[in-house]
């Protein structure tokens, strides 16, 4: 039996607002109707609830969501600001070309903090130190290499916490004078404020204009100032520190000590009663005090006075810009000094060498006109020179004038001056002068020349060591007893000792007539050396005495006369001073040797040649002329032809007929100014190809070194 709801389902469904009537099956329709009726009921309730929220609760919910977004935005902005400040405070981050990301900034900040606390490299701590060195030895080596001293001062108060014992050789102050004092007491009064700024770790009035090296622009310090003043930032400054005046005799006088003394005196001499200061370059870092993991005793707690930071630095003597006498002059006493003037001649700088040159201290000359020290008669000249050097603009101008020294004496000074121009504005900045004491400079130059002359005069030429040669062996291979017998400057006028050292093998080639040492060999200045001429000339052509020295034919006499005139222009003669030979005639003869009837030479020509003995040196044939028929062309008409034994006259006539044509045709073709060419003209005479090779006999030349024997 159907229920009333099921009797009219479409009608019931149509009564429900929002429902849709569908033609469905009865059973399905009943279920559909129930579902459809339930869903609108829920939807109506939800709408009513939403309507209530819109009316009553929509405002607070929207406000809470907006408030939450604003909080998150402000939080992100604050975090970005803090990370930006952290990036500025960490040196590794600020040194980057572009801004790093947040993670990189945090990582670098952690690394920087670890490095400051000393916990960043625990694994490698001490690995740099050699195993054989203790901590104290390593500290001394480091300080000695740095040539400085280590000191630690409190940042807030400047109290000295620690100073190394190397302060004693650097500043001549004992270590005890630094302990218990402040660093402000050790520096010059004018440098206290600069030191206070370097020790300060908080923001102060230092924030000013800085130069950006990357862009080249000048800008104000902003966040970089906090980075410069933060803990762990580097410090580097120059100040004047007080030096002790106690002599330190126990220190060794070495190069380092001399350099320290020179640098300490770089600021000039100290007046009596004033403290001496040295320029010290301090480099270090601001560190946390006390260090991490370190506790200080109670008695030392008041030293830091509750300080949180300290300066750990090394102080080293700074090389001063003032020139020092020993640096700029090698002399023991300087002769010049530098000065700088403005365009009006006012002295603005003087180097300390003026003390030794003119007697004034540098501070006595500063701010004064150079004309005040010039002689009245030279003032106009000096004034004109300064005006001229200003017009020259860079060119050097020298002037000499009289300068009044401190002891009221007039000193002749030479000043070489030139101007320095500003490269940007092309304006003259100042005038640089080099002032030289002329008299003292001349004295030093004279002393130097005397010293050089003394050094040359003490050099004995007679004691020059000779290279070690075999005993008694001459450079040409001949055996002599005294190496300098031939080349001696002081020699017997008749050259008696020239044949004293000849060996027995050479004596076989000499005749008995040449054994007398009192004979004159040749005239002085002869182009052919006397005696062993083959040894005197180290050329490839060997001079054979007796063949090359004396010729007797008229044709060869003319030839020799022409050669002699050519050789006399560039002849080789003895350079030593010898007394003139008695009876020496004037050189007006046509012969090269000037042997005439009035000459004191003996009539026997065999005394002139060691090869004149027919048994020892005459070859079989016409290789050598017999010299038997000498003509007046040789200027020896008073001699007979029978003096040369064993050389028939037909040999000479045959040689003359064969060689006269060739000699007359070639007498101008091979003549050279040198002596070697004469030998080349004469030596082919014995071995002319027209004579045939049969004229030579090797056995006849057994005693001559120029024809070594060989076995066929």
Swiss-Prot record:
The modification Omega-N-methylarginine is found at residue 42. Changing residue 106 to E: Compromises SIM1:ARNT2 heterodimer stability. Compromises NPAS4:ARNT2 heterodimer stability. It comes from the Eukaryota. One of its GO terms (cellular component) is nucleus. One of its GO terms (biological process) is response to xenobiotic stimulus. Pfam families: HLH (PF00010), PAS (PF00989), PAS_11 (PF14598). Keywords: DNA-binding, Methylation, Nucleus, Repeat, Transcription, Transcription regulation. Restricted to adult brain and kidney. It is found in: Nucleus. Residues 63-116 form the bHLH domain. Changing residue 141 to E: Compromises SIM1:ARNT2 heterodimer stability. Does not compromise NPAS4:ARNT2 heterodimer stability. InterPro entries: bHLH_dom (IPR011598), Circadian_TF (IPR050933), HLH_DNA-bd_sf (IPR036638), Nuc_translocat (IPR001067), PAC (IPR001610), PAS (IPR000014), PAS-like_dom_sf (IPR035965), PAS_fold (IPR013767). The keyword Mitochondrion does not apply. Residues 597-626, 653-675 have a biased composition (Low complexity). Residues 134-209, 323-393 form the PAS domain. GO terms for molecular function: aryl hydrocarbon receptor binding; DNA-binding transcription activator activity, RNA polymerase II-specific; DNA-binding transcription factor activity; protein heterodimerization activity; protein-containing complex binding; RNA polymerase II cis-regulatory region sequence-specific DNA binding. Transcription factor that plays a role in the development of the hypothalamo-pituitary axis, postnatal brain growth, and visual and renal function. Specifically recognizes the xenobiotic response element (XRE). Efficient DNA binding requires dimerization with another bHLH protein. Heterodimer with NPAS4 or SIM1. Heterodimer with the aryl hydrocarbon receptor (AHR) or the SIM1 protein. Interacts with TACC3. PANTHER family: CIRCADIAN PROTEIN CLOCK/ARNT/BMAL/PAS (PTHR23042). This is Aryl hydrocarbon receptor nuclear translocator 2. The lineage of its organism: Eukaryota, Metazoa, Chordata, Craniata, Vertebrata.
